[in-house]
Amino acid sequence: RQAAKGLSEALRHREARKVYWAAVAGVPNPPAGTISYGLVKGSGHGRQGEGEKMQCIHPDAISSTEGAKRAVSDFMVLSRLANRGAWVALVPITGRTHQLRAHMAEIGNPIIGDGKYGGSGQQNLGDGWGAQFGGDISKKLHLHARYLKIEHPFEKRIIEIKADLPSHMARTWKTFQWDLAESPNDPFIDEGL
């Protein structure tokens, strides 16, 4: 129980390193960088706020936008499918709700399968990425917590956890011929970012 509490605290205080993998529509340009748009909760359409989503706020407007919070994400293209799609590694420097999803959509490369932030093109109906990829890709969100590095709360040793891709993403990687062996656990460390 205390170990779980210690791990929760480490995550809350940003003492953990989390690397996510995503398949995105298009290819980010530049192929690596930092997204610093703030986030503010937009109103939903349902009675209880259902359907609400985070809206990106330009960094210069964060302090003057009520409810806006600073949000920072690093990204790096690991592989690409011409200009149609890319395998991207993502690290949330801050930990805001839907941060990675909103940030990737904001730079014009929404995560495949993200109906909330990617728009109607994410429904794989023959427009948007569905047409680009031939309609063979799962409609599920293509975002995966791939790697976690954290210090054990009592033993003070480093724990590293690597999670396999979920089946729908593994099929996409196979379809696009993206080789999992091409990527280190944390490409940002290996690239000096």
Where are these regions (language model features)?
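RNA pseudouridine synthases
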Residues: 1-193
